[in-house]
Design a protein with these regions (language model features):
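Beta-rich carbohydrate-recognition and catalytic domains
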Residues: 1-2, 10-190, 196-244, 252-256, ...
Length: 278
């Protein structure tokens, strides 16, 4: 079965958006490929052409496909089997120290990396890989840089108790093994968020607890913790929804924080909602 999956958008200039998406055969018969296509805000039309996104590793520059991502990680000791699909621009895009930063991920392969997007906005370059402990099957991370320069990523876990794991790095290249932290407990296997707005970090995570009316464990509760230093955290928001509240994205525009979130019965994604956080 084929799919166009996991869209991401970045603004190129006042008139143009660049839209990224993965095109994949989820049966694994061929390598998936990430593409981009530009959208003209003046004419409200897409360019007639689509283009392949490229991947730069220590070994060279290749099409952004899972086999090249896996080969780069294997050079650093990654031992999980290769997957032909599931490579996504997961956590994007953040401006940090003059660079456009993102986290990329192969979901079925439990593979993650910190990366940059080049100035031409057509090539992803890997900075460093974080995949340990392998038995936790880390995936779908969100990353930011703390005031002391340390990189911190919160990762979804697909094994064990499935609570979120945190990995850190001083240089973005060498990372610590993932560990749980006490301010995030009873986490569920769903994508987290980690943003910084006006000097405040916003860290969002899915909770696996049952909600008040007795519905079962699922993506019904989403918490947002805030911190100025990335060390001391406090709860700012708790969203509860019978029909799920999952995979939100938060963005700041004109002094306000906006969000888009998916919702649906039984944890599916029947609709997308848009709103103002603060």
């Amino acid at each position: 079965t084929g799919a166009c999956f996991v869209p991401r958008i970045i603004r190129l200039d006042d008139h143009t958006l660049r839209c990224f998406f993965a095109c994949e055969d989820q049966g694994g018969r061929r390598q998936s490929q990430t593409w981009y296509r530009d959208f003209d805000l003046r004419t409200r039309t897409f360019s007639p052409n689509i283009h392949r996104v490229r991947l730069r590793t220590a070994e060279g520059t290749f099409d952004l496909q899972p086999n090249h991502f896996h080969a780069a990680a294997a050079k650093h000791g990654f031992k999980q089997p290769a997957k032909a699909f599931g490579l996504y621009l997961l956590d994007s895009f953040k401006q940090i120290d003059g660079r456009t930063i993102l986290a990329i991920n192969n979901f079925p392969g439990a593979q993650n990396a910190l990366a940059t997007l080049n100035e031409a906005r057509d090539t992803i370059e890997i900075i460093g890989h974080y995949n340990e402990p392998a038995e936790a099957r880390l995936t779908e991370s969100s990353v930011n840089r703390l005031p002391d320069g340390t990189w911190l990523a919160i990762c979804r876990s697909e094994s064990g108790n499935r609570n979120y794991r945190f990995v850190t790095s001083k240089d973005g290249r060498t990372w610590s093994p993932g560990e749980e932290r006490p301010f995030v407990s009873k986490g569920s296997n769903s994508k987290p968020t980690f943003d910084k707005f006006d000097g405040v970090y916003y860290l969002g995570w899915q909770e696996a607890s049952r909600i008040v009316d007795g519905h079962g464990v699922g993506r019904y509760i989403f918490n947002v913790e805030v911190s100025r230093d990335g060390v001391t955290w406090e709860r700012k928001y708790r969203f509860e929804a019978i029909e799920s509240f999952q995979y939100p994205t938060f963005r700041q525009h004109d002094g306000s924080i906006w969000f888009a979130v998916t919702q649906g019965k039984g944890g599916s994604t029947d609709r997308i909602m848009f709103g103002k956080l603060e």
